[in-house]
């Protein structure tokens, strides 16, 4: 993992600047912040400590972050891009589109589609009319090849057997391309013999848009062979030309696979095609030790907090690769994540499947066996990781309290802390174990990290430090204190272990 650490530029969409230009001084020139380092001028990486993205992700690369001691991992999330509420809206939009398929079949023509389009096989079952029972058709876009089972309805033919993706991407008939007629004809005579019965003139097209009220579908689900295209191969509509693509892109020689779901296109409540985006497909997480490029990481999402204390038994769908698809609902795609039975009552049932034993997975403490090394621990459920985030650190689960949703975790400092079992933690040790063992051969290496020289308190003025001032080299006086007057020697307690009334 150490040799595979990538030290190139980070994703611009996942970085931000700390707008601090005071250099640690206030308006009077007094130093208010000591040893700030060089972090104020660096690009800060946005680390996802909440791990609130989709449930499955692939590690694209391990990066070096100059702002923290550990390494970070760039994860591309491949499952559950849309939240459950968005998935429901997307399914309702599909049902509305299927009901209006016949209407679009009368208004749209497929004669203008290129012949190089992909062949689509589609099966549909409808129970609306006797003639719309089971239609199995194979449609070659740009041609008029239909099987015998295709039903012909209306002057423009029936499109009930066509997939909805093709109907959404069809061009209106009055936008069909028109070639010029013979040179012997002039004016409108050159266009009149070439204008078919299924095409409109410019004036007829305007009347059709205003009088019929037929909506014009703008969708990016079908790629045309001509026209401007985005980087992902999708057609750009007229109103999107010139806009900047704000989707995160990979820097350097790394490329993004074509099958990675970035966003799903659906029809919103207003009826116009729009893109549903909930969370970015790329996020930074703290890299665990032994986490390599290409590994799969998982985020646990429990719909009911009460079920987090139950025992987990993987279902048959866990081993089915077809279960990890975006088209499924959130409950179906994560059904094997929901535990069953009693878990905290017996210590003989601490059995986890392979997903729970993988390094880098973020799951609740109630689902982790006793003795497991964890990091990135939450203090409150859903708050985000607050404990054990430094390089090479780890905590250990010591005990799980019976009949209560709490467990005891031993932190790197040796303190045993009682934490809610619904809080999530990441399995493994924080990466970059040798961070504390490095040696600086010269003072410049420390300055490269943004660390300024340490100035003694006796060398300062009285206004800057309690030990400052005096004639010549002064010794003695008060015990060693910090610039704010707190004792710095041993024996001074800074943490209150127990509070008593």
Curated annotation (Swiss-Prot):
Xref: InterPro entries: NA-bd_OB-fold, Rib_uL2_dom2, Ribosomal_uL2, Ribosomal_uL2_bac/org-type, Ribosomal_uL2_C, Ribosomal_uL2_CS, Ribosomal_uL2_dom3, Ribosomal_uL2_RNA-bd_dom
Main localisation: mitochondrion
Biased composition (Basic and acidic residues): 464-474
Swiss-Prot/TrEMBL keywords: Mitochondrion, Ribonucleoprotein, Ribosomal protein
Keyword Mitochondrion (UniProt): yes
Polar residues: compositionally biased ranges: 198-213
One of the protein's GO biological processes: translation
Keyword Cell division part of the UniProt annotation: no
GO MF annotation terms: RNA binding; structural constituent of ribosome; transferase activity
GO cellular component: large ribosomal subunit; mitochondrion
Subcellular location, record wording: Mitochondrion
SUPFAM superfamilies listed in its UniProt record: Nucleic acid-binding proteins, Translation proteins SH3-like domain
Protein family: Belongs to the universal ribosomal protein uL2 family.
Protein name: Large ribosomal subunit protein uL2m
Organism of derivation: Marchantia polymorpha (Common liverwort)
